[in-house]
């Protein structure tokens, strides 16, 4: 079985392709077959990826050079077991397109906090790693509203007139915004930190299911 992850941002040229690249690389050696894809609710199909965010942190251009922007579709959302949106507007676009996705659609930063919390508590045991991952996603959804999310932060706009803008704690901001963008360095730092957390949690769940080392009695039963 495969576990499918869809990453989403507005144009599918900067944030979601970078999240896709990092997750794909981190999960490449997993015994479970992860399929990671990306799309954008306002994407211009075929557009090349922005490599600035990757260059800031030493990711080679080759990892993004083959990327071409893809418009978010109902089929892509329906196929995904987990949707990771860059920010709340992109997450809202996913749910508008496919309302039944609300329980498996999160922002990246929201998902990282919920997943880390879920994996640190008593969780279900499953023989099949994909079942364990699906149960994790369900648990993450159940935890909404019960776990403290990151607070909003203020970041400097990297052009005149110099000022600071507030970024919601659930969002990875868009460095390509026409008004009040933040720097690519801020964006890449947030993506790397939270994608790393997600990859670590997903790998832990797979490993626990594969070798039977997961917590004992399940408090959530899949399906």
PLM region spans:
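Conserved active-site segments centered on acidic
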Residues: 1-82, 88-92, 96, 100-101, ...
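Phosphate-binding/catalytic loops
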Residues: 95-223
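Short secondary-structure boundary segments
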Residues: 87-88, 109
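Acidic side chains
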Residues: 81, 87, 170-174
């Amino acid at each position: 079985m495969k576990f499918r992850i869809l990453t989403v941002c507005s144009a599918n040229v900067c944030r979601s392709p970078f999240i896709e690249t990092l997750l794909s690389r981190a999960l490449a050696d997993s015994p479970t077959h992860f399929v990671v894809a990306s799309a954008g609710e306002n994407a211009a199909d075929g557009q090349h990826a922005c490599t600035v965010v990757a260059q800031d942190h030493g990711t080679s251009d080759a990892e993004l050079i083959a990327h071409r922007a893809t418009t978010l579709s109902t089929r892509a959302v329906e196929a995904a077991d987990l949707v990771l949106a860059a920010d709340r507007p992109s997450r809202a676009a996913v749910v508008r397109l496919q309302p039944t996705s609300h329980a498996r659609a999160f922002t990246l930063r929201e998902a990282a906090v919920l997943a880390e919390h879920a994996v640190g508590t008593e969780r279900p045991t499953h023989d099949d790693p994909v079942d364990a991952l699906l149960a994790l996603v369900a648990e993450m959804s159940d935890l909404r509203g019960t776990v403290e999310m990151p607070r909003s932060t203020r970041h400097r706009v990297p052009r005149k007139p110099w000022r600071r803008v507030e970024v919601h704690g659930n969002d990875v901001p868009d460095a390509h915004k026409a008004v009040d963008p933040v720097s690519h360095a801020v964006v890449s730092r947030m993506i790397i930190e939270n994608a790393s957390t997600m990859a670590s949690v997903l790998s832990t769940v797979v490993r626990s299911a594969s070798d039977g080392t997961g917590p004992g009695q399940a408090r959530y039963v899949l399906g």
